[in-house]
Amino acid sequence: MITNGVIPGLFTLLLCVGLYRLLVVPLNHLREQANAWRADQLNVRLSRRTTNRADELGELGRAFDHMSERLQSTVALQQQLLRDLSHELRTPLSRLRVASESEQGLEQLRERIGREVDGMQRLVEDTLQLAWLDTERTRLPDEAIQVQALWEMLTENACYESCWSPAQLRCEVDASCWVRGNLNTLAQALENMLRNAIRHSPAGGIVALGGRRAGKYWHLWLEDQGGGVEEADLERIFLPFTRLDGSRPGNGGFGLGLSIARNAVQRQGGKLWAQNAGSGLRMNMRLLVHTSPV
C-alpha cells in the first residue's frame, strides 16, 4: 500500500519538476528580460537554453532578443544623433551671435542670418530624416521606376543649384533600365549622392551615372572626379556626421547625405557601397529589376 502511494507521488513530483523547467523557467527568463528593458538595460539577452529551443517558447525568446537588439541599436543611434546635432549647432549659433554683435549693415546682417538659419534648418531636417529612416520599418509601397527619367529630373534641379552644365552630368544608362522600389526614397538617395559628387568634383568636372543588369538586379554606379578617399574611409563615409579632411575638394554639408542615402536604399531591399575608381569615387547601388515596365 505504501509503495503504491509513493510511486504515483514520485511520478507526479517528477512531472511537476519537468513542467516547471519546461515552461515556468523560460517564462521567468522572459519576465526578467522585460524587467531589464524597463530598467533601461537593453543589453540583457536570454540564455541559449531558451533561444535554442525548437518550440514556441524558443521562437518567442529569439523574437525577444531580436527586439532587444533593435531597441538597443535605435536608442544608441538616437543618442549619438542628439550628441552630434547639439555639437553641429554650436558653430552656426556662434556665428549668429557674432553677427548680431557686429557693425554690419542691416541688409548684410539679414543675408547672414538667413544663411545660418537655412543651414540649421537643413541640419535638423536631415537629422530627423535619418532617425526616421532608421526607426520606421513599415514596408514602403513599390512601384516601377525608370532610372533615366529619374536622373533627368534630378540633374535639372542639380544644375540649377550648382550652376553646372547639363553636359557635365552624364547618363550612360538607357531607357531599358527599370527598377523596383519607392520613388521618393530612391530619388532622395540618388539626389544626395549626386550633390555629394558635385560638391567634391572640380568646377569643370564630370559626374556620370552608369549601370548594367546582373540577373534580377540592376547594378548602378555614380562616379565623380573628386580624387576618391582613403581605402580605410570607404565605409566610414556612410556614418552620420562624417566629414573627411581636405583630401577631396569641395566643402559644405553636414556629413549626413550618404548615411541617409544608404538607409533609403536598404529600406527598399537594395545595397549601397563605395569604391575608388579612376580619378574619383564611385557609389554603387544594387536595386531589384522591374521586369514589366508600363
Residue ranges and their predicted role:
Residues 1-82, 94-104, 119, 232, ...:
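Membrane-proximal HAMP signal-relay module
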